[in-house]
């Protein structure tokens, strides 16, 4: 208060004022850092909302649909994993007539009249070559029973399958019994959908969890930094004393090391001087003995 009355402030007062000014500057810097971290947090929150909008717009799941069962087709040439279009074309070419031609009767009648005899003839030849003629009638009767239980080919369903192959996406094709009988399941699309590559955009729930983790880490780092800085400002004198004691201990250690080095150097020099005087004494003794 002396400078308010017109007198010059003392040195201690000037040092105190300078110290408080430094503290105020550090506090302002800490406030600016915290404000910058808050800005980063708000920006990340806005980006999170934007990612949520992208997820809902482009990575939405299709509406739940029922599985469409395609009739089993005894094609014999379609293997699991082949293209659906090729499969439908193959089935259509095998069962339906070529353009401009018509079968007489239904597919079932053509099967009974045309393909059945050829198949039975080939079956008899293969059976006779492999197993002989015995028990052929028993095997033939068993084959008849299995043939009655197997489903017939439906030409209308084949037409429907071939016409709608561009709107269907096969998701499962499993074999039952042998490779000649295939079950094909497909999903009918309910609307246009656009899917991003897998792993490029994560779901909203996972993205929120990751941003929450980032927020927690940033908040903890800012809290620890601010706490340490405020503690340093409050306990400045104590910290300075600790640092001064460290420096004093280091100076004492260096001084003691220097003194020890000087003592060793002095002792070595004394030994050298003592050794240099010995030849002079011997020379004097020889002179005295000869005289």
Swiss-Prot record:
GO BP: cellular response to osmotic stress
UniProt topology in membrane: Single-pass membrane protein
GO cellular component, one term: membrane
Disulfide pairings: none
Main location: membrane
Keywords carried by this UniProt record: Membrane, Stress response, Transmembrane, Transmembrane helix
Spans traversing the lipid bilayer: 213-233
Description of what induces expression: Down-regulated when grown with elevated levels of potassium chloride.
Compartments it resides in: Membrane
Functional summary from the UniProt entry: Involved in osmoadaptation.
This protein's name: Uncharacterized protein AN2204
Source species taxonomy: Eukaryota, Fungi, Dikarya, Ascomycota, Pezizomycotina
